[in-house]
Amino acid sequence: MDLTRYDKLRSAIRRTLSPDEAAAADRALEYAAEHTASQVRHDGSPMLDHAAEVARIGLEEIGLGGDSVVAAILHDVVRTASRQDEETFLRLTDEIRDRFGKEVLGMTVSLSHISDIRLKASREQAENFRELIVSYSEDPRVILIKLADRLEVMRRLEIFPREKWRKKSWESLNLYAQIAHKLGLYNIKSELEDIALRYLEPQDYQHIADKLAETESERRAFIARVLEPITQRLDQAGLRYHEPHQVDLLDLEQDAQAARPVRGGI
């Protein structure tokens, strides 16, 4: 497999990780390419595309370190092996432990366990599943890699069969977005919710998106006027700050639903 298609990830790795960590990530890419060469995604692209993008999200958008990046690259290798005979699985896990270390192996095995759990569409099940994920994740990095995994899936949801769209969107909305919220990963929470809403309620999503687009310049001007005196004071005090501006479409949708009259009246 031509690994130049993963130059974006490799560049991020070299910018962020130590030389030893970058070398381990390169070895992991080569190892994963060898073991997933015959596997493709629903659109015909190499299966490794998914793992490489999960690793990039973990590195650049979540801030994960070297071992986590290696585990993200290898997670599909271990998941596939776990569905084969025990001898094959044990041979491969021993190999990963020897080449990449015990911590990397532990994370990949935990991710495989989580992927094998089947969730039914109920809020009670979602709460139980959140607790189950935590129980499988003695290493907190496992949860973060899983969030990166789900974010990559949702960003590419159009390549999956249509019958999977609602299930994955429901899971993202009721499970993964809630985990991201509890971990303080609000950008990931909002993006998962927005994509899920686009697939679960496409008409409502488009209506809200159109209204936001119509009023964007007006909203930006208003926010700038409000923030100007605040940012001036912060600058004078030498304080660092971040100006959030993303509108959460799910919150707007929930507000709209709450404002709709109940059929039958009062």
Q: Can you say where each PLM-predicted feature lies in the sequence?
A:
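Active-site helical microenvironments for divalent-metal-assisted chemistry
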Residues: 1-266
